[in-house]
From Swiss-Prot:
GO terms for biological process: L-leucine biosynthetic process. [4Fe-4S] cluster binds at residues 347, 407, 410. This is 3-isopropylmalate dehydratase large subunit. Pathway: Amino-acid biosynthesis; L-leucine biosynthesis; L-leucine from 3-methyl-2-oxobutanoate: step 2/4. It comes from Bacillus subtilis (strain 168). Its EC number is 4.2.1.33. Keywords: 4Fe-4S, Amino-acid biosynthesis, Branched-chain amino acid biosynthesis, Iron, Iron-sulfur, Leucine biosynthesis, Lyase, Metal-binding. It catalyses: (2R,3S)-3-isopropylmalate = (2S)-2-isopropylmalate. Catalyzes the isomerization between 2-isopropylmalate and 3-isopropylmalate, via the formation of 2-isopropylmaleate. Its cofactor is [4Fe-4S] cluster. Heterodimer of LeuC and LeuD. It is an enzyme of class 4 (lyase). The keyword Chloroplast does not apply.
């Protein structure tokens, strides 16, 4: 057999029917659902008199539009109907549900891995674009639309066009203060928001190998912002150790057998990617987005670019539009940009590694008077673990708000929004116009960078923090 990439191996293992010159029919191992994109799909099943094909392969939670304060008091009528519909649909169709009373509740892309539902080699789908998060485990995971949600519910399969393969390799050693979020932002900043279109990315190199699973999930989460269908990292001992003893993982000899199978999930020597790019991890800095898409990003010690620095006319026009929306001027120093809000959370950066990084920055300090800062754990499990470690007290004593789990300020579908014209340092994944609220100005950063912005009221190079610690 010809050498294959891990992407090709997983794809080939899941083909139910090969489409000659057409999409392949893939078997789906895990279907994750939430309250926003599932109601219409269940209604479609009901109208056609169909059942959920594999309820045991389906898992639901509520996350997008639930409050993170007084979570049981949902005031928005649409949100309330969606949550109620999910409860009714899961009961009727026999689907497991982690509702607001469950210790398993949280953002769908956080709870899937921590419960052991997400495992190497699986095909995973969800009606949410950031399903690529699960690729951190060596799974092929991607978002789908509502009609596809219905198709998977009724057949446990999905027609998909075979993707091209793209290697993103980052070697070297990251500087102190440079995180997984900075790495993926640096990749997108260099190659743009469309370079991954039509591809599934495999992240390779020592920088990714040295990351925790939480950090790998951050990277794979933002594969979508690079335009890719999905992104993944081949499983290794770090992956296997994370998966061990999770609620839904195999146990004992079954787990050991699974690990032996998972070890084969790596790209063969001699396998050829359709495209490869390489970055030097030593040169990556803490990053801050300045514009209205994730590709408009620069090192924190940079200046907002001038229009003449863009060669393409469309890029110049987009930059001018960004200046106007973001309220910035060319040559303005990134570190001089003041913020009124700080959000630490989302499916990108709401796990224990993220909260520890942020807490490390603020211990013994106070949030600036001009800033409102909130921390939203990605799941009830993360919240409980953080409280066990005393992180909640560090945040509260510094002046942060400590919330219940949910998608929160990542998107303006719940009570947590940024007021019009105000600026937020956010650990989420999208800085589109209006993403955090009408007229809201979003700057994407790492948890460490967000925490420092909360303390100082403006962006600060977190590398200075580590330099000061070294001197002390």
């Amino acid at each position: 057999m010809m050498p294959r990439t891990i992407i090709e191996k997983i794809w080939d293992q899941h083909i139910v029917k090969h489409g000659e010159g057409k999409p392949d029919l893939l078997y789906i191992d895990l279907h994750l659902i939430h309250e926003v994109t599932s109601p219409q799909a269940f209604e479609g099943l009901r109208q056609k008199g169909r059942k959920v094909r594999r309820p045991q392969n389906t898992f639901a939670t509520m996350d997008h539009n639930i409050p993170t304060v007084n979570r049981f008091e949902i005031k928005d009528e649409v949100a309330k109907r969606q949550v109620t519909a999910l409860e009714r649909n899961c009961e009727e169709f026999g689907v497991r549900l982690a509702d607001l009373h469950s210790v398993d509740q949280g953002i769908v892309h956080v709870v899937g891995p921590e419960l052991g539902l997400t495992l190497p080699g699986k095909t995973i789908v969800c009606g949410d674009s950031h399903t690529s998060t699960h690729g951190a485990f060596g799974a092929l995971a991607f978002g789908i639309g509502t009609s596809e949600v219905e198709h998977v519910l009724s057949t446990q399969t999905l027609w998909q066009q075979r993707p091209k393969t793209l290697e993103v390799r980052v070697d070297g050693t990251l500087q102190k203060g440079v995180t997984a979020k900075d790495v993926i932002l640096a990749v997108i900043g260099k190659y743009g928001v469309k370079f991954g279109t039509g591809y599934v990315i495999e992240y390779t190199g020592e920088v990714f190998r040295n990351m925790t699973m939480d950090e790998r999930m951050t990277v794979c989460n933002m594969s979508i912002e690079a335009g890719a269908r999905a992104g993944l990292i081949a499983p290794d001992e770090v992956t296997f150790e994370y998966c061990k003893n999770r609620k839904y993982t195999p146990k004992g000899e079954e787990f050991d057998k699974a690990v032996e199978e998972w070890k084969a999930l790596r790209t063969d020597p001699g396998a050829v990617y359709d495209k490869s790019i390489v970055l030097d991890g030593n040169k990556i800095s803490p990053m801050v987005t300045w514009g209205i898409n994730p590709g408009m990003v620069l090192p924190v010690d940079s200046e907002v670019p001038a229009p003449e620095s863009f060669s393409a006319e469309d890029d110049k026009k987009e930059a001018i539009r960004a200046y106007e929306y973001m309220g910035l001027t060319p040559h303005q120093k990134i570190e001089d940009i003041k913020v009124e809000h700080v959000f630490i959370g989302s499916c990108t950066n709401s796990r224990m590694t993220d909260l520890r990084q942020a807490a490390d920055m603020i211990k013994g300090k106070k949030v600036a008077d001009s800033v409102r800062a909130i921390v939203v754990p990605g799941s009830q499990s993360v919240k409980l673990q953080a409280e066990k470690e005393g992180l909640d007290q560090i945040f509260l004593e510094a002046g942060f708000e400590w919330r219940e789990s949910g998608c929160s300020m990542c998107l303006s579908m719940n009570n947590d929004v940024v007021p019009e014209g105000e600026r937020c340092a956010s650990t989420s994944n999208r800085n589109f116009e209006g993403r955090q609220g009408k007229g809201a100005r979003t700057h994407l950063v790492s948890p460490a960078m967000a925490a420092m912005a909360a303390i100082h009221g403006h962006f600060v190079d977190v590398r200075k923090f580590y330099q000061e610690k070294t001197v002390v």
